[in-house]
Amino acid sequence: DTMLEKNVGTLTFDVGGGIYVMNHNNSLGFAKGEMCSPGLATQAEDLYAAGVKELIHVGFAGGNKIGDYVLTDGAYNDTSITRLYGFKGELIESTKDLTDSFCIELEKKGISCIRGYHWTTDGGYVQPEWRGRYFLNDMGAKCVEMEGAGLFTIANFRSRKATAIYIVSDSGSNDEWNLGWGESTLENSIQKLIDALVKS
């Protein structure tokens, strides 16, 4: 929604929720992502079928510090969509070369990220468990969200490229979730990332 408010792209293709091609660079575009792994997986199928070669998901996640950026190397899978596509392992990778090049571009624009694996779950209201299951043990998940595993499943299945960056919007660093919506820290992180993407 914020990208649309900035009027930086033009709706060009009515597929995958609508592809907006960037006004300053017609090789780049954006679409509003669907919610949850099955939704984003279906959207990714549509976008890849329409000819999109690479997808970078920009989303929100629960993590340790509101406003932090997490650039993911892949997702610990706690969803059903991956198994339907034949991926039975606990971890599904993002595309390393795309993640590496995106990391370099972000650094050039002054955005530093926490990098590593994260947890994708279908259970949006039981996410506080992530600290015990994935963060506090040797797995070291950097955040928890609900779409990444679905996207990476389709990218791997279709031999396309995908990665993701998450802005920590709520914190599980205490016994209860602290929601960052409306806080200047979160809003500043959102605007900084969007400004960097618009200038890509």
Give, region by region, the residue ranges found by the protein language model:
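Metabolite-binding pocket within alpha/beta catalytic cores that recognizes anionic/polar moieties
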Residues: 1-97
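Conserved active-site and cofactor/substrate-binding residues in soluble primary-metabolism enzymes
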Residues: 35-38, 42, 50, 93, ...
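His/Asp/Glu-rich mid-to-C-terminal helical/loop segments that flank catalytic regions of hydrolases
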Residues: 172-200
